[in-house]
Design a protein with these regions (language model features):
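N-terminal loops that bind phosphate or other acidic moieties
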Residues: 1-117
């Protein structure tokens, strides 16, 4: 039997690859291949960058409420792979900081600018 293990990440718990490896441990008969997948959310840039044989770059930008942070994006040939959540995601904020009237996606723009340089 051949099996394809394609599991999305479990937000805040397992990456797609980690989930696939856990499932592979339970697969004892036949051949299995792990293919990381993403619905376009958390982990998307990592999966796409690695699938394209790209590299990662880290840049200083600002989180949704203006604090300086370091965020990572992918580069594959002349294509930048930027995940909005890296600079503008809710996961960067504490619960008491969640306020759409004060949040900004400026940091994502900073990542785009860094990629263009």
């Amino acid at each position: 039997m051949k099996a394809l293990i394609a599991i999305d990440s479990f937000k805040g718990c397992l990456t797609s690859m980690e989930a696939g490896k856990a499932a592979l441990e339970a697969f004892t008969e036949g051949e299995a291949e792990i293919i990381p997948v993403s619905d376009g959310g958390e982990g998307f840039s990592t999966i796409l960058t690695e699938s394209l044989g790209g590299t990662f770059r880290t840049a200083v930008c600002h989180d949704p409420i203006g604090r300086p942070i370091k965020a990572r994006y992918g580069l594959a040939d002349s294509t930048a792979i930027i995940e909005t959540a890296a600079a503008s995601g809710l996961g960067l904020l504490r619960k008491d900081e969640l306020n759409p009237l004060k949040a900004t996606s400026y940091g994502t723009g900073e990542l785009i600018l860094d990629a263009l340089e």
